[in-house]
Amino acid sequence: MGHETEISKRYQVAKERYQAIGVDTENALKTLKDIKISMHCWQGDDVKGFLNPDGELTGGIMATGNYPGAAHTPKQLRQDLEKAYSLIPGKHKLNLHAIYVDTDEKVDLNEIEPKHFTPWVEWAKEQGLGLDFNPTFFSHPMFKDNYTLASPDKEVRDFWIEHGKRSRKISEYFGKELGQTSINNFWVPDGIKDCPIDRYTPRKRLMEALDEVFAEKLDEKYTQEAVESKLFGLGAEAYTVGSHEFYMGYGITRDKLICLDAGHFHPTEVISNKLSSLALFSKGVMLHVSRPVRWDSDHVVIMDDELIEIGRELVRNDLLGITNIGLDFFDATINRIAAWVVGTRNTQKSLLKALLEPTADLKKMELENDFTSRMAITEELKDFPFGDVWNYFCEINGVPVGLDWLKEVKAYEEDVLLKR
């Protein structure tokens, strides 16, 4: 009890300090509690899935490491996810890829139906979670010559068009069953290793294939689609069909959400700087918060400058209402549950940091060219007791404070993961 009282006491001191500069910490905590993070299932098993778990991971991505304890069945994955969610404050969502089917039936990607994901839906209901979805355009024999929807081979295109259509029905099913809009994100890794002669025709094929996938109108109360660009992948270094410009044009003209993945751009390019522009022209954004180290390496998200900047952009520009925040990283060199917990809690921390700024006052200073005050206040804020507010948020949401969560992860590793 003394431990809790100490956290509460420290919070009261922090609350007064923030109050002195016009920041209401109670409001900040209330806002943060309502923000759902879509945690990705694929960190739990290194992107293997359950459709063909022994198959090769393709699509220009790579999971490195062999830390023990990866999930091998849907039941194990759900068990691990439950442990992770128990260490993260608030109620969130789970982001599923199509290869995470849960069925005894032998089924291919162009045959999947809502019934193949019913166990996930029943579990999400029990846990109070929402579900997002992703068709899987990789790790499959029909990913031919680095192409799926942009393939010159009609048979290949048709297979993937059918997969895309079926994924929409599954996402719609999630939305109907769970009462939360399911975001269905389309990332298509099609590309060419070396300099292509014709960049135009594959993009035209991709555009036409996507138009066919999206032809049927679905109720956006249940499902909304996002389209995700990428600069390059392994084996597609020279050219990716679904570039940023392609999907910006496609998303805006087809009324789709634009997905921005932190690792899918040039190494010195940041997605935080793109949010305000997209907010002016697109219907909304799906974020894949990730950490690229020299390339799209999908490292676990840490509290670095870009994560802090993403939080600031969303809060300062009032973009939380049109932004869906998801995570996308997979590191097999560390405990996978710890990866989820660190990445999700850090994303929440970046939002809290931004919510604890006197945003209206700072905007007024900027408008009046009072750059001295703007700099002085933003610099002083760096030393404010943000950690005490975060610890209190964890406490009132019934999750471990500080490093206490790590003890739970280590115990779970000993009792469960190392016995697999």
Swiss-Prot record:
Pfam families in the record: RhaA (PF06134)
Pathway: Carbohydrate degradation; L-rhamnose degradation; glycerone phosphate from L-rhamnose: step 1/3
GO molecular function: L-rhamnose isomerase activity; manganese ion binding
Listed cofactors: Mn(2+)
Reactions performed catalytically: L-rhamnopyranose = L-rhamnulose
EC code: 5.3.1.14
Enzyme class: isomerase
Keywords annotated in UniProt: Cytoplasm, Isomerase, Manganese, Metal-binding, Rhamnose metabolism
Keyword Metal-binding tagged: yes
Alphabetical GO biological process terms: L-lyxose metabolic process; rhamnose catabolic process
SUPFAM superfamilies: Xylose isomerase-like (SSF51658)
Lineage top rank: taxon: Bacteria
Compartments in which it is found: Cytoplasm
Chief localization: cytoplasm
Co-factor binding comment: Binds 1 Mn(2+) ion per subunit.
Annotated residues for binding of Mn(2+): H264, D296, D298
PANTHER family for this protein: L-RHAMNOSE ISOMERASE
Described purpose of this protein according to its UniProt entry: Catalyzes the interconversion of L-rhamnose and L-rhamnulose.
HAMAP family per record: RhaA (MF_00541)
Assigned protein family: Belongs to the rhamnose isomerase family.
This protein's name: L-rhamnose isomerase
